[in-house]
Design a protein with these regions (language model features):
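Extended, solvent-exposed regions of the mature portions of secreted/cell-surface glycoproteins
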Residues: 88-185, 411
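Low-complexity, acidic Ser/Thr/Pro/Gly-rich terminal tails and inter-domain linkers that flank the onset
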Residues: 256-279
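Extended hydrophobic-aromatic, low-complexity segments
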Residues: 87, 216-219, 246-248, 298, ...
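Acidic glycine-/aspartate-rich tracts in secreted/extracellular proteins
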Residues: 84-85, 213, 241-243, 525-526, ...
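Short amphipathic beta-strand and strand-loop transition segments with alternating hydrophobic
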Residues: 94-101, 271-277, 325-328
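Membrane-embedded alpha-helical bundles of multi-pass integral membrane proteins
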Residues: 206, 212, 233-236, 242, ...
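Extended surface/linker regions that mediate inter-domain or inter-protein docking
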Residues: 1-86, 174, 184-202, 210, ...
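A eukaryote-biased signal for short, well-structured alpha-helical docking elements
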Residues: 229-263
Length: 560
């Protein structure tokens, strides 16, 4: 029996955002703190190095993890080392940081929070700068006004000694102005969550960076200077925890993610109005576009394309138009008239969406690089024959996708938000194979996440290559539909108007909507025969047994 208290660096709740739940060695061990009792620094599978190696597809303790595919960027340390609360090493934090700016003023608001420290003062932009706050001691918080600019620095000074305890840089962002911001979905911070920044070591850092063949003893491949690091005490000489600069050699700077760099002005598009929306008419869209720093001219953008899809019961119409040159300025807004009309037989409500980006210069540490600054895609439902617009049902919440993927951005990074993806990945969308494979959203996402457990695999052929998802391993429990679904959208029966899926590589095509949802995961012949015998040309009878509250309801057969 020992009195040792494990460090609180990464919480179980954070692990369970993907692992759902974390459970190893017969499911007995279910927390990082428990795991680290055995996987301690005396072993070649010490926990910190082991976890880094597993998630970065490396090697640890003689085990090869090269087949592991991490669902987001491995450089984003705060996916696991979730921050946002004061620690002993960093007693002052700003929430949010970066501060949200959606009005183009370049100025935001944040809340400063501090831990239990003795008498102190907080000054602006210099050790003797303008006084912001002064307290005799203890934890607390104070909101700033709307004057935070990129690079605002708060100095936390000890009033007794006059020494600066911490310098905190706060920036601004436009991420989150339209939808849930990439990277905003984080776990629960541990009490020592900044340990990754203030305790660099050769073993822990090398467990991720072993692919570059760094030899700390000789200095080989350890920077262009071949720096020798005989022990961990030398790491902090170059790799200070945090400098306030992006993409430098500080621990935080070296792991700065491009998508939330303060150097990106952001692209904020707001749909103001859609008119001329009767069947057969070409819609007219009024919109605004700006960055955190001010207005943007559409013609100057690298890309700005509007999407119209519908009807919102389930999409089978899709049009995409470049709006940059055709937009006309009216006051502070812009107006674009679609060239393509709505179908003559259009009914109900339709949806307007977009994809857009700028290319901007970013100082990435040792060079200026042109990088994409991508807009978050707003969506707007508009009425065609409905009295008022009826949005498409929400099947999944993109925040749940981001819980594991953190910055889910596909097709060059410009397609974000699962509820925008469905505007293109509709029931009739297929790849270029012969016969074709469905890339309908539910069929595709179910199959990708089922991966190696599929009986028949899943391969998508596109013009730029063939993509085989048959070896993917889902890190959680696939029976937990709520990991992705919202509003009981996985329950049967599905709403009226949901369309069949074109599935030419499956047993028959099209596959009726309820069967398509089930057979995309349960892809064996037995399941297909069962679905087929309970389907007729005019409908499905799945809900007779699998409906909500029935003896074999979706919840019951997926109980976990």
């Amino acid at each position: 029996m020992y009195d040792a208290v494990p460090r609180d660096i990464v919480t179980t709740a954070t692990c369970n955002r993907c692992h759902d739940p974390l459970a190893m060695h017969g499911s007995r061990w279910q927390s990082p703190q428990a795991c680290s009792q055995c996987h301690n620094p005396t072993r070649n599978t010490r926990f910190d190095a082991l976890i880094h190696a597993v998630h970065s597809a490396g090697e640890a303790g003689g085990h090869d993890f090269s087949e592991i595919e991490y669902p987001t960027d491995i450089k984003d340390c705060q996916v696991c080392h979730t921050g946002g609360t004061p620690t002993d090493a960093f007693p002052l934090v700003a929430t949010p940081n970066a501060a949200l700016v959606c009005d183009g003023t370049g100025r935001g608001t944040t809340m400063l929070e501090w831990g239990d420290i003795d008498s102190f003062e907080i000054r602006l932009n210099a050790v003797d700068g303008t006084l912001f706050a002064k307290y005799p001691g203890g934890p607390g918080s104070q909101e700033t006004g709307k004057w935070i600019e990129d690079g605002t620095v708060f100095y936390l000074n000890d009033m007794a000694s006059g020494e600066t305890i911490q310098k905190l840089t706060v920036n601004n962002t436009a991420l989150g102005c339209v939808s849930n911001a990439p990277g905003a979905s984080r776990g629960e911070p541990g009490a020592q969550h900044t340990n990754w920044m203030d305790h660099p070591s050769r073993v822990v850092c090398g467990s991720c960076h072993d692919h570059s063949d760094v030899n700390f003893e000789t200095g080989e491949n350890h920077s262009e200077f071949g720096i020798v690091a005989p022990d961990d005490n030398t790491c902090g000489n170059c790799h200070v925890p945090y400098s306030g600069k992006e993409f430098d050699r500080s621990v935080a700077g070296a792991h700065q993610m491009l998508y939330n760099s303060a150097q990106l002005p952001g692209v904020i598009v707001e749909f103001k109005e859609v008119t001329n929306t009767n069947p057969g008419d070409a819609p007219i869209v009024t919109y605004s576009v700006k960055s955190k720093k001010g207005k943007i001219i559409p013609a100057d953008m690298n890309r700005l394309r509007f999407v119209i899809t519908g009807p919102n019961e389930d999409y089978d119409f899709y049009v995409l138009e470049d709006v940059r040159s055709g937009s006309v300025q009216v006051g502070d807004d812009w107006v674009y008239s679609f060239n393509t009309p709505l179908p003559m037989d259009a009914e109900g409500s339709f949806t307007l969406g977009l994809e857009g980006r700028n290319v901007v210069p970013v100082d990435v540490g040792n060079e200026i690089s042109d990088e994409r600054d991508v807009a978050e895609p707003p969506r707007l439902a508009f009425a065609v024959t409905d009295a008022t617009a009826v949005p498409r049902r929400m099947v999944v919440d993109d925040a749940k996708c981001e819980s594991c993927h953190v910055n889910l951005a596909l097709h060059g990074g410009g397609r974000r938000d699962a509820n925008y993806c469905i505007t293109c990945h509709s029931p009739g969308l297929v790849d270029i194979a012969t016969p074709s494979e469905s890339v309908h959203m539910k069929w595709m996402v179910h199959k990708i996440h089922r991966g190696e457990d599929l009986e028949n695999g899943y391969v998508v052929v596109r013009s730029r290559g063939t993509f085989d998802f048959s070896d993917k391993v889902y890190p959680g429990d696939l029976r937990n539909c709520d990991a992705c679904h919202v509003n009981n959208s996985q329950q049967l029966p599905l709403p009226d108007g949901v369309l069949p899926t074109i599935t030419e590589q499956a047993w028959w095509s099209p596959t009726m909507p309820q069967a398509a949802a089930c057979l995309s995961c349960h892809d064996g012949d037995d399941a297909a025969v069962h679905a087929y015998t309970n389907t007729t040309f005019f409908g499905e009878s799945c809900s007779t047994c699998h409906g909500e509250g029935k003896f074999a309801s979706v919840d019951r057969v997926h109980a976990h």
